[in-house]
């Protein structure tokens, strides 16, 4: 299987987990000269983050991010691919400590796709930009012959400015904060993809909705007040909370210890994931921030997040030094034991975002 897996592209290569990291390293990162992986003393593909930072003569940094959105289905409870495409790139700029300013988009549509559906999607997309005061400064539009593309794909480039970018390197002693329930978006998309009575019952009875939204009203005031004390920030999209924490543990050469009972997960999400044998910490969120914060200000930061309307924000773990478990995430389970939280492997939920 290993040889076959290396010979052909699989869905798992795009899942945001271990296989994604491996193929990017093999086909892209290893082929780019070190001096061309960033601009000046900025941040680029030399560092595992969702955006790049380019130093400007003024001392500020230009924050740039790009993402392709292929979510299936394109309409789902709580949003659609248009809301997702706008919010996703806005959030990637925000997590780098930037203020989003502008966006470009590329829309590729399958021949025969309903015009009314495309109009709704683009209304959603432009509506988010209007609400956030973000300019749409360019883009591209193409149509593929029927059967050569599944409905619609939107790619967005987000652009912002940061006084000091947040470069994700958690420090020993930091507390890990999650801003809201995790896994909602992933559970909704997975339920729709699986179909069947059980999945539809989950959506109908629980009224579960995707959490997709821009995190501007959280991150801009938070960075303004506590930016120097936030040592890492990420939105747990593909690969979920598990992938974020594993990335951080690896890049900081630390062990991150989290408490399962402290992680905010809706009971219906936990139940649905458990029924499928999936750890909900692998499910994507599209309106959640994960932060690594200086312990001296953790309580103050949590209180401030609550005042901003994020009442479910809480500490879920901490960053520790460990020779034996450096680069790992360890979870204290609800039964009092410990287990290693592995990074996601395989293709748990295809086309989740």
Which residues fall in each region the model found?
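Helix-biased detector of long, well-ordered alpha-helical tracts
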Residues: 1-353
């Amino acid at each position: 299987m290993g040889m076959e897996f290396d010979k052909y592209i699989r869905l798992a290569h795009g899942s945001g987990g271990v296989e994604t990291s491996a193929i990017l390293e093999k086909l892209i990162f290893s082929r780019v000269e070190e001096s061309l992986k960033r601009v000046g003393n900025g941040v680029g593909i030399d560092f595992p983050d969702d955006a790049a930072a380019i130093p400007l003569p003024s001392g500020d940094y230009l924050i740039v991010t790009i993402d392709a959105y292929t979510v299936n289905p394109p309409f789902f409870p709580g949003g659609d691919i248009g809301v997702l495409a706008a919010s996703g790139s806005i959030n990637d700029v925000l997590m780098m400590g930037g203020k989003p300013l502008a966006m470009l988009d590329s829309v590729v549509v399958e021949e025969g796709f309903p015009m009314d559906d495309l109009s709704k999607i683009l209304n959603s997309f432009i509506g988010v930009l209007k609400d956030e005061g973000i300019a749409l400064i360019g883009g591209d539009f193409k149509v593929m012959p029927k059967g050569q593309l599944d409905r619609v794909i939107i790619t967005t480039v987000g652009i912002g400015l940061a006084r000091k970018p947040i470069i994700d390197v958690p420090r020993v002693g930091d507390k890990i904060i999650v801003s809201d329930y995790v896994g909602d978006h992933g559970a909704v998309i997975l339920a729709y993809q699986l179909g069947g009575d059980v999945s539809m019952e989950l959506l109908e009875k629980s009224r579960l909705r995707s959490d997709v939204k821009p995190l501007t009203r959280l991150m801009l005031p938070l960075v303004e007040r506590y930016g120097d004390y936030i040592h890492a920030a990420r939105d747990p999209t593909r690969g979920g909370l598990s992938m974020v924490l594993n990335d951080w543990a690896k890049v900081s050469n630390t062990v991150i210890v989290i408490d399962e009972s402290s992680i905010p997960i809706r009971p219906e999400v936990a139940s649905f994931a458990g029924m499928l044998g999936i750890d909900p910490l692998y499910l994507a969120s599209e309106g959640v921030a994960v932060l690594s914060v200086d312990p001296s200000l953790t309580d103050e930061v949590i209180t401030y997040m609550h005042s901003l309307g994020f009442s479910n924000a809480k500490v879920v773990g901490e960053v520790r030094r460990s020779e034996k478990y450096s680069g790992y995430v360890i979870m204290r389970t609800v039964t009092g034991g410990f287990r290693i939280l592995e990074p996601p492997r395989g293709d748990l939920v295809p086309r989740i975002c």
